[in-house]
Amino acid sequence: IDIDNHIYLVVDGYIALILNDGSQNSKIYSIQGKGTFLNYFTLLDQSNNHFNFKTLSGCSLYKYSKADMEYFLSMFPENFGFQFFIMKNQTTHVYFKSLMASSPASEKLKTTFSNMALLHGVLSDDGTVILPQAIKTSHLLSYSNLSKSCFYKDLQYLKTTNQIEKKEKCWIIHDQALYTMIQNGQTSF
């Protein structure tokens, strides 16, 4: 990936954005999926990329030069809707991460599951929301910013209270309100 000169559209698959803060234990900032542009913010503010990208599954990407994207989005007013869609998607990820970061420690894991469900969940016929197999427990731990002990304690609580379960390597969320939100196309609380 040439982050200095290109922007990438995720056609399929999942990619983790890991904050490049110089520490060895950098955490997942967001998980991007189909329809998301990687490295897009660098086009807007001409800044350096602050993320490392890690594929979580097999992925297909389209590569666009920054110069072509800038020309395409700025020269034609009819592309304003396209720009809006890209920015809405990007800011939804930022908004969800801020909600999770500002929530009390006891709610961080539940918020993590809700965020991932709103971004990537698949509705099941039984009224549950299924996270893609590519989003593993270790990814949820990294995204939540919880210590391992707090994470696994909270994970056990969510399991024993039947809010989540794991079947066939996929996390399943039992939350009718969340299911209804996704069904109605809502992307935030």
What are these regions (language model features)?
Residues 29-95:
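Cyclic-nucleotide recognition modules
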Residues 13-15, 35:
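Short, small-hydrophobic-rich alpha-helical interface motif
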Residues 1-12:
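Regulatory nucleotide-sensing modules
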Residues 1-3, 21, 32-36:
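Conserved short histidine dyad/triad with adjacent acidic residue
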Residues 14, 58-60, 170:
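Structural motif
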